[in-house]
From Swiss-Prot:
It comes from the Eukaryota. SUPFAM superfamilies: P-loop containing nucleoside triphosphate hydrolases (SSF52540). This is Torsin-4A. Belongs to the ClpA/ClpB family. Torsin subfamily. It is a single-pass membrane protein. InterPro entries: ClpA/B (IPR001270), P-loop_NTPase (IPR027417), TOR1A_C (IPR049337), Torsin (IPR010448). PANTHER family: TORSIN, TORSIN-4A. The keyword Membrane applies. It comes from Danio rerio (Zebrafish). One of its GO terms (molecular function) is ATP hydrolysis activity. GO terms for cellular component: endoplasmic reticulum lumen; membrane; nuclear envelope. ATP binds at residues 192-199. Keywords: ATP-binding, Membrane, Nucleotide-binding, Transmembrane, Transmembrane helix.
Amino acid sequence: MGEQDPSDRLRGDQLKEPNQNGKGSFSQFSSSVRAMVRIRMKYQAIKKRRMEIASATPQIFTSPRSTSPKVFTFDNLHEPVNSNPASPRKRKKKRKGRVLYPTSSLRAVPTKESSRAKNCLYLLCIIVFLQVYNAIENLDDHVLKYDLEGLEKTLKREVFGQQEVAEGLLGHLQDYLSTYVHNKPLVLSFHGPTGVGKSHVGRLLAQHFRSVVGEELVMQYFVLHHCPTDDDIPVCTKSLESHISEMVSQGEEEEKIPVFIFDEVEHMPRQLMDTLRELIQPQNSNKYLNAIYILISNLGHEDITKFVLHNSSIAISGRLSLTQELTPWLRNYLQEHHGLFLDAEYLPFMLLEKSHVMDCFIDEMSREGFYPDRSHVERLAEELSYYIVGEREFSHTGCRQVVAKVNLL
């Protein structure tokens, strides 16, 4: 059965009432009619509003309005409840996974921006590499002007039996001449018996450095010649100090390293050694630190001779380097002699064998224009005296008498 309209039910009730009573008045009838009309108009307005709401809302979201009281159940708990049934429910837009590009620009995948710190790090590495490379180039340029390769060839050609000394000398010069600014001067101390080549190496060094830095920056000081007597010591001291100061100042101006060669140091007066010691102190002003001092003497030559003769059989087997073994003892001995040797690098010269003396004869005879006949050279070498240790022969005086023997030819 369908639901009966309330206005029809009310009208039926009103029509039945006059029939039952039969005696209702006209005024009562008219008031009832007016009430019925008002109810009907109100009902029609409510119905029209419901139809308008139903037509505006999509069919999927609409549900028939029930006049029965609403009872809460858990059946439709998952469905969203619209708090305002009068307002239309808006559709949620789904987010698209793809990237939307503007139509006015080229389509390109966005790139991740790289860190700028890496670029700065690369730039810093390049700068450091260039600085180091430039420093190495400058070191090479500074060494090249001293022509140490030419000095090495000269030592190999004219110095016999002192290979370790030549290698040590070139190593010290290479390290020191690589830079111009130093915190201390280079002090080299030559020691050994008579005739082993100490003064000869000093002359070769003087000739070489005169050719590369100039005559004014090389000084050869022979103690017995420049300061022969004790009365000359005060004058010699002032003259030496003044001369060294002038040469160092000139070296500073020309950015060159002066060379001072002192021969016969064993005869140098103590006052002169004290003055020289003050000039080469590492804590001295920078003016005196960029210089090379070479000290030549035969201090401790007797002990050096005994050491070489005692260890010659061991050294020939290659198990011992006489220079390395002799240096610690020589350092202690010379430091007790005077403080001038405290900061020195020691280069001990060994005894010369008979074969080395023969090389000296051949070289000297070639210089004097004689043909170096082998038998003649051996006969001249036999005239000298030697220390005999096993099968080895060491000359008492080295090559000192070679020049005199050749001059007698």
